[in-house]
Amino acid sequence: MMRVLVVEDNALLRHHLKVQLQDSGHQVDAAEDAREADYYLNEHLPDIAIVDLGLPDEDGLSLIRRWRSSDVSLPVLVLTAREGWQDKVEVLSSGADDYVTKPFHIEEVMARMQALMRRNSGLASQVINISPFQVDLSRRELSVNEEVIKLTAFEYTIMETLIRNNGKVVSKDSLMLQLYPDAELRESHTIDVLMGRLRKKIQAQYPHDVITTVRGQGYLFELR
């Protein structure tokens, strides 16, 4: 079973894809535009995304490029009515992993999804171990004492950055830049809120506070 993010502005097609995928045993989040897609991506951490190019608020290729620039690594399958070879090159160059041209059969979508997941799972696992903490870079998961902690994409990005810099202070500005490449979206208090939630989740598995706020400098991950 996979958690699939479907990003499609056509309501009938979006519903059809959602139902077919659910009938095949998958969990599905269905977004009608890029803004909603970003929400599901950050909150539900999907395994794979199916993205239509003609979204009302942002071009699908732009959305994929933005995800890739923010180190979002999940496989992306594009739905497109564009059949020219130049269009296909543009799709793949944007950071998409594969594409299906419209009209399509749902069986082809399923087959390409499975192929992408097999390819993704075949990549060598990259893990950072600072016992009892473990970060699986390929799965974007944080474990403590071999128990996976459920994190949002933003929370995971913070923890990966702090653990990569174990024992070193990471500035708030540096974290904000990774979370929000678009300067207009950055609000300094957002990091404080995320840190509060993150500390609570970690302390439910590990009794000591491993994230220290260094006043005027940033944050420090350090085992005590």
From Swiss-Prot:
Phosphorylated by PhoQ. GO terms for biological process: regulation of DNA-templated transcription. Residues 3-117 form the Response regulatory domain. The modification 4-aspartylphosphate is found at residue 52. Residues 125-223 bind DNA. Keywords: Activator, Cytoplasm, DNA-binding, Growth regulation, Phosphoprotein, Repressor, Transcription, Transcription regulation, Two-component regulatory system, Virulence. GO terms for molecular function: phosphorelay response regulator activity; transcription cis-regulatory region binding. It is found in: Cytoplasm. This is Virulence transcriptional regulatory protein PhoP. It comes from Salmonella typhi. The gene is phoP.
